[in-house]
A protein has these predicted regions:
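Internal gly/pro-rich beta-alpha loop/helix module
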Residues: 1-6
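Thiamine diphosphate
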Residues: 7-163
Length: 163
């Protein structure tokens, strides 16, 4: 990504280095400059969409969830239309981001899914628009439901309690 930011993209590029570092990528993972990548069966009925550090967490979560796949966004603006189309095929879509709810990438995806006319249920989990006190990364992820256990619980709970 840094190479592309310096030598390829002509405009401004933001690179985020999260506090606490990045987790180890899964075996066989290689960044291939595509705007997104699908992990798991894209025909599954549930889809987790994320980017950044939470990708590893979501990937771990699908190990405990049935019939679920992950879309990892490598580029968050603009969201690739193919990523929107892939998510729209699922019956339930959960977007997890380590950013604020308002103006976040999840809101953008929700708008794009609405424009597409998807009938899938959409859930957006992010940090509320409030002051976040200093604490360890792990405790904050738990507090805001962005850890593996919370993700697994939320997805399973939604399945048990359909709208």
């Amino acid at each position: 990504m840094l190479y592309q930011a310096i030598y390829v993209d002509p405009g401004a590029v933001a690179i985020r280095y999260p506090r606490g570092g990045e987790p180890t990528p899964p075996d066989g993972y290689q960044y291939e400059k595509e705007p997104f990548r699908i992990f798991g069966d894209p025909g599954a009925k549930r889809c987790l969409v994320t980017y950044g550090r939470l990708f590893d967490t979501c990937l771990q979560a699908i190990g405990e969830l049935d019939d679920t796949f992950v879309i990892k966004l490598n580029r968050i603006r603009p969201i690739a239309p193919e990523a929107v189309a892939a998510a729209a095929k699922a019956q339930g879509i959960w977007f997890y981001e380590e950013a604020t709810v308002s103006g976040g990438v999840g809101q953008t995806l929700a708008a794009l899914l609405e424009e597409k006319g998807t009938s899938a249920r959409f859930f957006h989990k992010a940090v509320p628009d409030t002051f976040v006190k200093h604490a360890s990364v792990d405790s904050q992820l738990r507090k805001f439901g962005l850890d593996k256990a919370s993700i697994v619980s939320e997805v399973n709970h939604a399945e048990e309690n359909p709208a």
